[in-house]
Design a protein with these regions (language model features):
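Hydrophobic anchor at the beta1->P-loop junction of P-loop NTPases
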Residues: 5
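P-loop (Walker A) phosphate-binding loop of NTP-binding proteins
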Residues: 8
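Conserved lysine of the Walker
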Residues: 13
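Hydrophobic positions on the alpha1 helix immediately C-terminal to the Walker A/P-loop
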Residues: 16
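Post-Walker A helix-loop "phosphate-sensing" segment adjacent to the P-loop in P-loop NTPases
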Residues: 22-33
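ATP-dependent small-molecule kinase phosphotransfer cores
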Residues: 32-103, 107
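A glycine- and Lys/Arg-enriched "phosphate-lid" helix/loop adjacent to the NTP-binding pocket
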Residues: 94-157
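NTP-dependent small-molecule kinase module
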Residues: 130-202
Length: 202
């Protein structure tokens, strides 16, 4: 089963992905976590250190190249894996970032989404931008403006693909979010990651 997690920065994508895979492995199941980052955090830190800001189109070009490479490599690894595969981010995230910056969707990323194996479940972790902003400030590894998070949330919900996403409330304690995720996976036809398996791992 292939699951993709999306959502604004601070929505808890990485935390939920890591916890889901850990729960599945603890229950005796085969599970694989794949990260489809675009290098935004590193580029932001580098820009801040150098005191320069890359134009949105240049930043998008670099991010798209990095994310596309990671997504293609992730699908290559997922193809031969038997078990639960959780992808932390996907190409939809780049399309939402383009929307946030007022850039066109283009043709390449939507085409790539269509030809790649379709995930069994694309989960959108929905959180109030103010709570997401507080989480980002608390972790202290990067920074985001509240207005950008609000704009990104709007951009996600404006994606043509969004109606096919499973929207989960991501506010509150991580344990509650994880329970909602496991229930969504079960509803989509997969076994709950936290239920023990008597089968041998692949």
């Amino acid at each position: 089963m292939l699951i993709v997690l999306t959502g604004i920065d601070g929505s808890g994508k990485t935390t939920a992905a890591e916890a889901t895979v850990a729960a599945a492995r603890q229950a005796g199941k085969s599970a694989l976590l794949l990260r489809n980052y675009a290098g935004r955090r590193r580029m932001s830190l580098l820009s801040a250190r150098l005191g320069i800001q890359a134009p949105p189109r240049l930043a998008d070009f670099l991010e798209t190249a990095v994310r596309t490479f990671n997504v293609l490599n992730a699908h290559r690894r997922a193809r031969n894996f038997h078990g639960l595969v959780v992808m932390d981010r996907h190409l939809h995230c780049q399309l939402a970032l383009r929307g946030m910056h007022g850039l066109p969707r283009g043709r390449f990323l939507p085409w790539l989404i269509r030809i790649l194996p379709r995930p069994d479940l694309v989960i959108y972790l929905d959180v109030d931008p103010r709570e997401a902003h507080a989480r980002i400030l608390a972790r202290g590894t990067d920074s985001e403006r509240l207005e950008d998070l609000e704009s990104l949330r709007d951009a996600y919900q404006s994606l043509p693909e969004f109606p096919r996403f499973t929207r989960l409330t991501a506010g509150g304690p991580p344990g509650d979010v994880l329970s909602r995720m496991h229930a969504a996976i079960e509803k989509a036809g997969g076994p709950r990651p936290d239920e023990c398996s008597h089968a041998s791992p692949h």
